[in-house]
């Protein structure tokens, strides 16, 4: 299945709580590549930060992933790694979780994107 999808396009990966991952998996996002590595990681309160960081770095290195979706509360735990990622691909998008609403003030990627545009250029 992963080989077929890789031919058609790139993948979206998900790092988050069980509810977030299950939702995206039910939506058809889940894949396992030829090396038997999934494109998602379920994080719970017992997941070590080092494991979360390693997974994020693995997703960054995979050439079949173009977008990484990560729960914002997970992103907070590895903020230094996310901030070090400056390449546009894979794009990293912070999303809310069931228990933690999205807070735009914590999203460093959004702050970077806002800095790229002059607000006066957007008004016509």
Swiss-Prot record:
SUPFAM superfamilies: AtpF-like (SSF159468). It holds the Pfam family ATP-synt_F. The keyword Transport applies. GO terms for cellular component: proton-transporting V-type ATPase, V1 domain. GO terms for molecular function: proton-transporting ATPase activity, rotational mechanism. Keywords: Hydrogen ion transport, Ion transport, Transport. V-ATPase is a heteromultimeric enzyme made up of two complexes: the ATP-hydrolytic V1 complex and the proton translocation V0 complex. The V1 complex consists of three catalytic AB heterodimers that form a heterohexamer, three peripheral stalks each consisting of EG heterodimers, one central rotor including subunits D and F, and the regulatory subunits C and H. The proton translocation complex V0 consists of the proton transport subunit a, a ring of proteolipid subunits c9c'', rotary subunit d, subunits e and f, and the accessory subunits VhaAC45 and ATP6AP2. Belongs to the V-ATPase F subunit family. Subunit of the V1 complex of vacuolar(H+)-ATPase (V-ATPase), a multisubunit enzyme composed of a peripheral complex (V1) that hydrolyzes ATP and a membrane integral complex (V0) that translocates protons. V-ATPase is responsible for acidifying and maintaining the pH of intracellular compartments and in some cell types, is targeted to the plasma membrane, where it is responsible for acidifying the extracellular environment. This is V-type proton ATPase subunit F 1. It comes from Drosophila pseudoobscura pseudoobscura. The gene is Vha14.
